[in-house]
Amino acid sequence: MQIIIDHVRHEYAGVAALRIFHDLPGPLKAEKPDRIAGFVPDVYAFDAPLTVRIIGEAKTQADLETAHSQEQIAAFLAFLGQQEHGVFVLAVPWAAKRLAHVLVESKRAAVGAQSVRTTILDDLTLRREC
């Protein structure tokens, strides 16, 4: 999950007032992402005034193949598709990169979220834009 946070900080360094919430263990009362369509994202970021919303998820290859993860990804893409500038970042092991790309593109088409910018991060190349 840290790879997603680092990516967002780097890619959106010029965005004023960017807030990043994450689901990493931390101090009590640390701000965590809110549920979106019943799912809690690993990373949720936005700025003020609102110009971008970013949702990040970290998945293993086995996770990508579960119905839960596929429903979660579809829900996040659908939510972001309703935003003016939605961004979805998915971090996976290098071996799962192709599967992740196919899954994200399939779900993005299924929910009508073609306007959502997507990025697939992996542990070797660190970044691959869809």
Model-derived features: positions:
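Well-ordered, non-membrane alpha-helical segments in soluble/globular domains
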Residues: 1-4, 67-76, 100-105
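Domain-level recognition of nuclease-like catalytic cores that cleave nucleotide substrates
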Residues: 91-130
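Nuclease catalytic cores
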Residues: 1-9, 13
